[in-house]
């Protein structure tokens, strides 16, 4: 009789993380594990194994044998923002500059997970600031979006966190952030509205106090 592999046996017998190619490209993830990462991954694998059983699946069938490992690895990637400090990223790329007009990086691709259902939401972020003696490397604005996105989120908080990190480090005359995203928790379940888009904004400084500055930003992101 074939012995069923229990969640604890997954940890004992699983392959190292250099692992197999499942054909979807997930084997290209960063597979370097610390001891703590390994323990976390083992716990995630056991949880996924149990979930598969609870939804009525057989975790031992061929197509699911490596699913706990793959899901655990995916979760490590999708939540890696918990282990990064966005303000430190900004601090590393600050430059003194007299430029005092708007700096806008628009259409930054964004992928995150709703903390209520752990389903993805994705879309675009538009980030602008008006310098006050300091500018930052443009890629760091996109990196700030990425770090906060790679956490369990609600879009409203995500928008504010991006604004606040930039405001805290650069101390500019103002920051503006708009996020437009589609939430799969509204598409795959619940109201099942396929074409719904959620838009959130967070402003500070002159983007709050000057209607013309705010209006310029909103016009630019709609082009």
UniProtKB/Swiss-Prot annotation:
Protein name: GTP cyclohydrolase 1
One GO MF term attached to the UniProt entry: GTP cyclohydrolase I activity
Keywords: GTP-binding, Hydrolase, Metal-binding, Nucleotide-binding, One-carbon metabolism, Zinc
Domain of life: Bacteria
Pathway: Cofactor biosynthesis; 7,8-dihydroneopterin triphosphate biosynthesis; 7,8-dihydroneopterin triphosphate from GTP: step 1/1
Similarity comment: family membership: Belongs to the GTP cyclohydrolase I family.
SUPFAM superfamilies, sorted: Tetrahydrobiopterin biosynthesis enzymes-like
Gene Ontology cellular-component terms listed: cytoplasm
Alphabetical GO biological process terms: one-carbon metabolic process; tetrahydrobiopterin biosynthetic process; tetrahydrofolate biosynthetic process
EC numbers, comma separated: 3.5.4.16
Class of enzymatic activity (EC top level): hydrolase
Reaction equations catalysed: GTP + H2O = 7,8-dihydroneopterin 3'-triphosphate + formate + H(+)
InterPro entries named in the record: GTP-CH-I_C/QueF, GTP-CH-I_N, GTP_CycHdrlase_I, GTP_CycHdrlase_I_CS, GTP_CycHdrlase_I_dom
GN (gene name): folE
A family per Pfam: GTP_cyclohydroI
Subunit structure: Homomer.
Amino-acid positions noted as binding Zn(2+) in the UniProt annotation, renumbered to this chain: 114, 117, 185
